[in-house]
Amino acid sequence: MTDSYNSSRLPKIVFFHGLNNNTGCFGPLMSHFRESGFETEMVILPCHGENRKEAKNSKDALRVFAQSMKRLEKTSYFAIAFSHGALYLQLWMEKNPGNKPLKQILLAPALFIRKQKLIEKAMKILPSFVLVKSLAPKAFRRYEILTAGEYNILVQGIVTYQKIMNQLKVPSLVMIDPKDELVHAQNLKAKLEEKNKGLEVQFIERPYLKKGIGCHHILFHPDYYEKQDWEEFLQKLHSFLKV
């Protein structure tokens, strides 16, 4: 399925991946939008590019992310942001009133996570070098395993966001699988809808999905949908991005 657009006036679509995702994770979705006439690019999250150690904590990571966003200062763009990438984008918009996306699609945004208080306590105890198993499917992983310090950048970002969260800064489509293993889908829906009048967080249900731990967190890839459901998912994205 492709929608017809006038490519001469289309904003760019900028993608933001999640924690421990590689640059190929959005491949099919980016190709789909390019075939529809959009120009696409991806923002690489802190510690996921050439320098894995460029940020030691959430504050460092947000500084690095803000530097990456400078290249979009004069760009008209839509954002499609997944998980940790969605968190970075919201934190950046809270502090940077500059060139925000025209619209944003948030896929399983890591703004509220399951067992959050327990995880926060664990992160305070664990040395930063302790290895933590990645829930990202192997095909989408940047690294085979994470450190507690790298995972804590996500956790502390979530804590910060929850302290300062307000209304979403731009028109938003938010989608989440209610069985998401990382994001607390029900809390996400309740909190965002409470803060944003008229917003409906959409549940994407896939009862047939049996690809192991972490599979319900993946919303961006056709291998995690039956064909008709993937087509419906794409249609929702296109309908929201109509210009």
What are the residue ranges of the model-derived segments?
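Short alpha-helix in the alpha/beta-hydrolase fold that links the catalytic acid
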Residues: 184-194
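Catalytic nucleophile-loop/oxyanion-hole region of alpha/beta-hydrolase
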Residues: 48-73
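C-terminal alpha-helix
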Residues: 232, 236-243
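Short, surface-exposed "cap/lid" segments of acyl-processing enzymes
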Residues: 2-48
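Active-site signature of alpha/beta-hydrolase-fold catalytic machinery across serine-
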Residues: 28, 91-95
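The alpha/beta-hydrolase serine catalytic core
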Residues: 109-170, 177-183, 202-234
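Gly/Ala-rich beta-loop-alpha elbow adjacent to hydrolase catalytic centers
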Residues: 80-89
